């Protein structure tokens, strides 16, 4: 029995959900999303709740059950609240600015890094050293944040680079004479 998979996903007011074979579609105030579930899993809409069930009892069925339920729950949360990831930029002269549909990053290279903002994602720079990535698709928000962090990940000696807000960077001591 999956601890996560056995719980139904509640559909809040203002959100509509539909199940068409293996496809679960959810529409809400922030937009619409859909996910195609694997063959081992079936979804059903019962009384304002989405229930996820296994089609068999193999270990693969059990492992896909909890994951599929979480994917559907993320759809519902995305179209109601949305998701956000905060990034911090540390380093002398390191900064970020949003220019139209591009993110311009100055990260200590001889050139500025230009990152085109994907469709469905919003990036805000409340301060030159802070970025907020928001959207309704949890996977896409996390992917964009990871791609931005990858341009100049935090280094362990001075802590310079792009890191997630609240992320702990293990610091190393420099060479001793």
Curated annotation (Swiss-Prot):
SUPFAM superfamilies, A to Z: Ribosomal protein L6
Task: Kindly name one Pfam family recorded for this protein.
Answer: Ribosomal_L6
Question: Which protein is depicted?
Answer: Large ribosomal subunit protein uL6
GO cellular component, as recorded: cytosolic large ribosomal subunit
Query: Keywords in UniProt for this one?
Result: Ribonucleoprotein, Ribosomal protein, RNA-binding, rRNA-binding
The keyword Ribonucleoprotein is annotated on this UniProt entry: yes
| First and last residue of the signal peptide | none
* Stated role: This protein binds to the 23S rRNA, and is important in its secondary structure. It is located near the subunit interface in the base of the L7/L12 stalk, and near the tRNA binding site of the peptidyltransferase center.
Gene3D superfamilies, per this entry? Ribosomal protein L6, alpha-beta domain
Quaternary organization: Part of the 50S ribosomal subunit.
Instruction: Output the GO biological process annotations, alphabetical, semicolon-separated.
Output: cytoplasmic translation
Molecular function GO terms recorded: rRNA binding; structural constituent of ribosome
Q: Which PANTHER family match?
A: 60S/50S RIBOSOMAL PROTEIN L6/L9 (PTHR11655), LARGE RIBOSOMAL SUBUNIT PROTEIN UL6M (PTHR11655:SF14)
Q: Which family does it belong to?
A: Belongs to the universal ribosomal protein uL6 family.
């Amino acid at each position: 029995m999956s601890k996560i998979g056995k719980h139904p996903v509640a559909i809040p007011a203002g959100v509509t959900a539909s199940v068409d074979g293996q496809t679960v579609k959810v529409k809400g105030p922030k937009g619409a999303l859909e996910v195609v579930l694997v063959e081992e899993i079936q979804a059903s809409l019962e009384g304002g709740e989405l229930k996820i069930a296994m089609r068999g009892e193999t270990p693969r069925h059990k492992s896909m059950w909890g994951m599929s339920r979480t994917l559907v729950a993320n759809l519902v949360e995305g179209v109601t609240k949305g998701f956000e990831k905060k990034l911090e930029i540390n380093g002398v002269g390191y900064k970020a600015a949003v220019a139209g549909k591009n993110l311009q990053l100055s990260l200590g290279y001889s050139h500025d890094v230009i990152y085109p903002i994907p469709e469905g994602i919003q990036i805000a720079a409340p301060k030159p050293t802070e970025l907020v990535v928001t959207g309704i698709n949890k996977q896409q928000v996390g992917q964009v944040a990871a791609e931005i962090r990858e341009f100049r990940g935090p280094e362990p000696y001075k802590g310079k680079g792009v890191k997630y807000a609240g992320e702990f960077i293990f610091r190393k001591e420099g060479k001793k004479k």
